[in-house]
Amino acid sequence: MPTGFVAPILCVLLPSPTREAATVASATGDSASERESAAPAAAPTAEAPPPSVVTRPEPQALPSPAIRAPLPDLYPFGTMRGGGFGDRDRDRDRGGFGARGGGGLPPKKFGNPGERLRKKKWDLSELPKFEKNFYVEHPEVARLTPYEVDELRRKKEITVRGGDVCPKPVFAFHHANFPQYVMDVLMDQHFTEPTPIQCQGFPLALSGRDMVGIAQTGSGKTLAYLLPAIVHINHQPYLERGDGPICLVLAPTRELAQQVQQVADDYGKCSRLKSTCIYGGAPKGPQIRDLERGVEICIATPGRLIDFLESGKTNLRRCTYLVLDEADRMLDMGFEPQIRKIVDQIRPDRQTLMWSATWPKEVRQLAEDFLRDYTQINVGNLELSANHNILQIVDVCMESEKDHKLIQLMEEIMAEKENKTIIFVETKRRCDDLTRRMRRDGWPAMCIHGDKSQPERDWVLNEFRSGKAPILIATDVASRGLDVEDVKFVINYDYPNSSEDYVHRIGRTARSTNKGTAYTFFTPGNLKQARELIKVLEEANQAINPKLMQLVDHRGGGGGGGGRSRYRTTSSANNPNLMYQDECDRRLRGVKDGGRRDSASYRDRSETDRAGYANGSGYGSPNSAFGAQAGQYTYGQGTYGAAAYGTSSYTAQEYGAGTYGASSTTSTGRSSQSSSQQFSGIGRSGQQPQPLMSQQFAQPPGATNMIGYMGQTAYQYPPPPPPPPPSRK
């Protein structure tokens, strides 16, 4: 090429340093002196001096033009990006395989998150005053006597500790004197009365008091702090340009933060309150734009909020209402240093509300450091407790038996009309492997864990909520904060490392006042957690698997295999453990012992039969035969055998009138035993059989058996057929 063409080509290819620096400076709002210092950085040469450091009242990171912005990820569902769970993957938006000029060095990071944030020295005399007590006691509440207050708290299992004088609890939403637009949304969502944590939490939060709320999962804690926050914000001056949020909610995971933001949007839009949700794993641009426009409510995970505070994208000067949601979970995830850095940026006379499901010493220490003269509200037992609306079934098995038992259990669950199920596993690899195996066998399963990109996690949760994929396999990233109302089953494929995680896992079902069932596979390798699990079961009045008791008594000797015969040699009358054991065996033994399941997999059925199977309408069409011979085990006909089974000694009449009792057809077309006959072989003659599971709380009026009260029908399918007669030679 002639040399005369080199210079023009270079002029075209090389961008002007001054223009690029001016573009960056105008986007970041830098001054002229800063643009001059940033100009050499756009096209560095060997002689160029290093950029000068500009001193600001607030530290602000200057973006380097040499580092290119990442392209959008074109394949968000096919790549594994980032590491860790929750918010720890907040640095995913740096250049990687999807960025231009791949292989470039990532931007320089400081050693610890929040290292550049300095603790502010507050002078309360110079800070503007603000009001935080807006509670006006309703006349109906004011007329309550001390005795009636104590009875109301006892009935709702509310315990109040600390503080000078605690307001009386409310027992209706209008007692809290919320604005009419808030009451309208409550009525639209068909809320009739506040939950126990809301009964005492509303008066405390509206009074401007610091408080700690300890309650089980799904107890309505989100509304307990968001509705008072709306009242608090509406009594503050309007935001001005450059102001940060008035209400800050810290949450441990992205999923919980998004759910809180959805609730805040539902209740705040009528009063034109703006809210935003900032979390890692998502693009920073939209989140920064929301903060720059001004939001009254900010729901954030600690890591991403630290990033924005360090870079000067937001500030907490106007924050007067601080909420720490799932405080115990944030400490478990190692966010305590970030939380302390964030709280140091907020004025000390703020109102602080801390919410947790457990009360370990780490959470107590955090409350002592952040809260002033606080009142503690406990709903239920202060000890670790599970939701009493959850039926807990523990199956003691070996590690190698889990897959087989899981498939048998899923065959039973998928026959239910409401069959949304969450399966919890311990590791990300097992989560992917189990999902791959189940999908290969035709199960509509999807998975979620910390290595999934945020778009994929959102997509999976939407598919799960809509019912298109009723099986969700997850790690502990979803064990807290995931709020899906109609989850009916939770399966602990792997038992968690602590009883606290167990309680939060099974708490994904039976949200609010619903019922649910939790299955747990417990292996001898989980022996260290056995005693704590038994305490949780006893506190919830659940029957305890005798294998689990034997595992504790014998320190895991034999894996619980020998205890079976020991318990079965005793009388089965009035033995709740035996009835529990029989029910677990009947549910989980499957085809091998002649159970209620056919050998065909969910994926092997035709579209018509599969739809009927998923809708709980039986096994395919009403006239389809179940077994090798037509009419042998005909479902949907009202009896368990239209023809004789085997020889003449096993006739249909003898079977219907024998030990198994007569059967009746339910509305769904499935055959089930009546409650008076299902235990005909258990108990003493002339004595009313005990309800299955022997739950020790009051049975509702009109209920004929307790298992129906706990969310399951007594027997959804007919009993197994009798064994064939011995062959005669």
From Swiss-Prot:
Widely expressed. Low expression, if any, in normal colonic epithelial cells (at protein level). Levels tend to increase during colon cancer progression, from very low in benign hyperplastic polyps to very high in tubular and villous adenomas. Residues 202-377 form the Helicase ATP-binding domain. Residues 659-688 have a biased composition (Low complexity). There is a cross-link at residues 129, 528 (Glycyl lysine isopeptide (Lys-Gly) (interchain with G-Cter in SUMO2)). A motif (Q motif) lies at residues 171-199. As an RNA helicase, unwinds RNA and alters RNA structures through ATP binding and hydrolysis. Involved in multiple cellular processes, including pre-mRNA splicing, alternative splicing, ribosomal RNA processing and miRNA processing, as well as transcription regulation. Regulates the alternative splicing of exons exhibiting specific features. For instance, promotes the inclusion of AC-rich alternative exons in CD44 transcripts. This function requires the RNA helicase activity. Affects NFAT5 and histone macro-H2A.1/MACROH2A1 alternative splicing in a CDK9-dependent manner. This is Probable ATP-dependent RNA helicase DDX17. It comes from Homo sapiens.
